[in-house]
Amino acid sequence: KDRLYLSGYFGRDVFNFGNTDNGIGIEIPWGNATTSLRWNHLFNDKLFMNTSLIFSDYRFEFNIAQSEFELKIFSGINDWNTKVDFLYQPNQRHTIKFGLNYTYHEFTPGNASGRSGDVVFEPDEIFKQYSNEGAFYFSDDFDVTDDLKIHAGLRYSSFQHSGYISFRDYLKNDVTSSDDNYRHIEPR
């Protein structure tokens, strides 16, 4: 038996402040958008699978303007996520869960542009950072007796940052970028 679910959320808020006496205007928009596609599959009465594809988008801006001066700062995070979770229940007293998860992150940290009179500052490229995050897990819940229960598991997590570590490194136009990797096995 199969079931397919599609869901989404979109929310954008804006804070505005203006003062006509000195001609200053401030606008701070921010918000989230997310969508997910989920597929549930029942292999048999003991094995169940849940697969999810998820996209999320977070945006934040700060804009200020006063007659001859403008400043805009933008940042955001986009995530693409895939999860596959299995639940195996050989009997009422024993449940095994296992699965994997992968997320691709795209960070846009604090890009700025501005104007002062006729002088305009606009970056040629938007500075971004990227990372990959993944995990495999396994857990076993076993009720030995009504008073003795065992819950054990392992999770292998990995995080990889790709790209320049700081904006200063980015401005140097280095040919190579820095990659950081973190991997751990975690008992559960």
Q: Where in this protein do the model-derived segments appear?
A:
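Outer-membrane beta-barrel channels and translocator barrels
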Residues: K1, N44-K46, Q89-R93, T145-K149
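Flexible loop and strand-edge segments within Gram-negative outer membrane beta-barrel domains
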Residues: D2-F43, F48-M49, D57-D79
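Membrane-embedded beta-strand positions of outer-membrane beta-barrel proteins
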Residues: L6-G8, T51-L53, F98-L100, A152
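Short beta-strand segments enriched in hydrophobic/aromatic residues
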Residues: F10, H41-F43, F55, P90, ...
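Transmembrane beta-barrel outer-membrane domains
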Residues: I26-N32, L71-D79, N91, F127-E133, ...
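Hydrophobic, lipid-facing positions within transmembrane beta-strands of outer-membrane proteins
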Residues: G31-L37, L53, N78-V84, N132-F138, ...
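Surface-exposed coil/turn segments at beta-strand junctions on protein surfaces, enriched
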Residues: L42, S75, Q89-N91, S139, ...
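Signature of Gram-negative outer-membrane beta-barrel scaffolds
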Residues: K97-R188
